[in-house]
Curated annotation (Swiss-Prot):
The record marks 327 as: Transition state stabilizer. The keyword Protease does not apply. This is Ribulose bisphosphate carboxylase large chain 2. GO terms for biological process: reductive pentose-phosphate cycle. The basic functional RuBisCO is composed of a large chain homodimer in a 'head-to-tail' conformation. In form I RuBisCO this homodimer is arranged in a barrel-like tetramer with the small subunits forming a tetrameric 'cap' on each end of the 'barrel'. Substrate binds at residues 116, 166, 170, 288, 320, 372. HAMAP family: RuBisCO_L_type1 (MF_01338). Mg(2+) binds at residues 194, 196-197. Heterohexadecamer of 8 large chains and 8 small chains. It comes from Bradyrhizobium sp. (strain ORS 278). Its EC number is 4.1.1.39. GO terms for molecular function: magnesium ion binding; monooxygenase activity; ribulose-bisphosphate carboxylase activity. SUPFAM superfamilies: RuBisCo, C-terminal domain, RuBisCO, large subunit, small (N-terminal) domain.
Amino acid sequence: MAEKSYQAGVKEYRKTYWTPEYVPLDTDLLAVFKIVAQAGVPREEAAAAVAAESSTGTWTTVWTDLLTDLDYYKGRAYRIEPVPGDDNAFYAFIAYPIDLFEEGSVVNVLTSLVGNVFGFKAVRSLRLEDIRFPLAYVKTCGGPPNGIQLERDRLNKYGRPLLGCTIKPKLGLSAKNYGRAVYECLRGGLDFTKDDENINSQPFMRWQHRFEFVMEAVHKATSETGERKGHYLNVTAPTPEEMYKRAEFAKSLGAPIIMHDFLTAGFTANTGLANWCRENGMLLHIHRAMHAVLDRNPMHGIHFRVLTKCLRLSGGDHLHSGTVVGKLEGDREATIGWVDLMREPFVPENRARGIFFDQDWGAMPGVMPVASGGIHVWHMPALTAIFGDDACFQFGGGTLGHPWGNAAGAHANRVALEACVEARNQGRPVEREGREILTEAAQHSPELKIAMETWKEIKFEFDVVDKLDTGPMLRVVNA
């Protein structure tokens, strides 16, 4: 440790935390923030202020700095880049020593990186765009309880995406009618049905009753079709104790999968539930309710790719990822980027998809992306092309809104999916020839034909709010 002397007072952050000569270590946690500084604040000072407040710094010099090796523990702002197309914003790259973070704790990482610093007066807006978790830290986290391959092995389903349906209306059904809808969808050809994010235990349908009627429907559909079926039973609850109580009851009924709202319930609850699922042989479906509060503003908050990485570390076998083509926000290239971060063992830097760093996941299993929100049979070719096999396509209204009923809606989706997969396997450009592929399949499926007629005019063509930053400064790294 270098010899130091204490000098009281306030000094510029950049004198301590701006280190452009620094070369990040393999064990450093790296972060990139999009910053708009207050008028008159130099960019280096704003970047250094973020590095300080998210690591060891405070607003004034303190004598207790002499009791530790501040030069080792501090965050270091080591690079600044302009944001293409925006003269006010810039990217600040910051390196943090791994010892700043508790092992296996996404909670602790986020408390540092997006804690007090987001209320800092020196910046007008601040967004955490990406994180590089070093492999040494990844190995301290539990990750997905099962992963994609183990899920396929348990379900005995290979070579195609999985199909699901969110039961609608999301609120107001009795447990018995809810279970009836589940049964009709599963016997019609779906692999899964799902509780919506805000179904917990309301007066119109208490959780015990829902679990019992739903699992009766699941077992009946499994017996009749000879296929393994499941329903995402939402165990999100007011307290962790109640959450585990619901999970245990789901297990006692023979449920293969449960569900959790990871952002509203919190990462502590989610990591604990993921550990429980790993120990009890249960799949864990993760809903991202509340994510857009954090990630939709392109100038302030946390990008969804960061939330995706944090969820993979915390634990979950499924995660809602957006659809690109449905009713919810999602740029195509950015979506493909975070889908890769969910599934792949190694993802290289690729600025064209918004990925700022290489990310090595080691042997950690992948998370299956769930495409859900305003999709129907006409979207099936695009979904197949965008997501490939290791995904779950979830049609709520696109199943339950079929004029002939739930089973017919499920059957139409299954026929459409298998037609697209077969065409893809034959080498046909599925997205470009989607209309022809579906029309050919509909000749042998009246359910699909009616579904195509019902939703032929339904499109969600709105401009994307959170677009990738593009321009002459964009660096593209081919995967």
